[in-house]
Amino acid sequence: MKFTKKIRIPLARRALFGACALPLLFTAPAAAASPDALQAKAPAGSAAAAVKPETGTALGSLDVSQEATRYAVQAATTNGYSRLVPRASEKQPQAASAKRPLSRVMHAWPVRQEDGGATLLFSDSPEYATQNGILYRDTVQGDVRVLYYHVNQMSMPKKVAVVLENVGAGTSMVTISRSGTGRPSPHYLDVGKEAQASYFDAQKPRRFYLDKGEVRVLDDAMEQTTLAPGDLVYGTYDFHSTQKVRVSVIIYPAYMSAPTFLRFARVLPADDLHLRGTFPQADRTLRAERAYDPAHDGIVYVLLADNESDRYRTGIDATDGSRVLNYGNYGILYHLDLPVQGRNWTQFYLSPFGGTYAGAMRVQLPSGQQRLLLTPPDQTFFGVGSDSMTETAGIERARSAGLGLLTDTMELADIGCYHASSAPFFLFSPPGASNLPAAIIMMPAEK
């Protein structure tokens, strides 16, 4: 894949391919920071260096490795492709790193799974919209998550909006607790990463009231956002409604208002991949069965969205009643509870096993500190080439048995170095425009 090319692989097809070609033996050429450079994020030796001077709380290495990208900005490269890069004045010097052995054995770390939380309305079919209409629709109440991912495949500018109609018995109070969108663009990985960074960044709740029978867009910004031909739009909204609301995701002419268009709009047929539907309990908690001890447990991993250890969610397409499968668990919010113990520090990485990957996540510490993590932190995407690999029978058997190899060429995104006193809690969701599965890797920090 070249930076100047547009990524036009359907979202569902990317995830499905990643599940069929799931290499733990990763030997693709590295496109992101080298593993040696990432290994440099080791804890300082002194106790004073492990304390934040302004708060006195424990300082994990995420404060160093991710601070440089906290104020990420868009910068145009010479080939016209936009990449997330840190400001030069905020780049941190890289310490010398110890050489990692060529390969190491990894073991699957046992976790318990619990599903609960919001109802997901997932709109990704038709992914390439060739006519105006309703892309997805359902009626919900309570905690709701809406994810939409669509490309304007028409010759004229369009808008995409989420429209609410109060069909309940009285006035509804609608509270948006979290949201994230990417600016429409033909560069899909840029859109995907920006949407995730926005979703996982710190934000305050927003609230409005919807009278009985009233129709309005979920976010006024949708009415001001135009998609040029070929542009992708991608957004995720978490909200709560005290009354039943009919939710419609629509694509419509740029010169019209969403409520006006909705009066005569019809539901568009799904495409062949049929990746749309309503999925209850869209929050998934993966909780380790025991705390990880870097002094005794070696290198371990937790696989995400592989449809084996972490099964895809099933739902219903409310427009026709058909059963659907969420290939990739897009829109599922993962709560990763992976405590550590012992006196030594633990290094955490995210690694893309399915191919090209551009995303973000969030970490919460017992001290109350929270931080946005870009994956990868130093460029828009990584993992190029891993989706072209196939598994040998031996590797497939090893993976089924919970074994893998951490090789010298595996691409890793540093998501922090933690001590038992600062055990992390991660929020993760599969990013649109990226390939799956992905893995969280835990290993002893380099001394």
Residue ranges and their predicted role:
Residues 60-63, 67, 130-177, 182, ...:
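Long compositionally biased, domain-poor regions of proteins
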Residues 42-115:
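N-terminal low-complexity, Pro/Thr/Ser-rich intrinsically disordered segments
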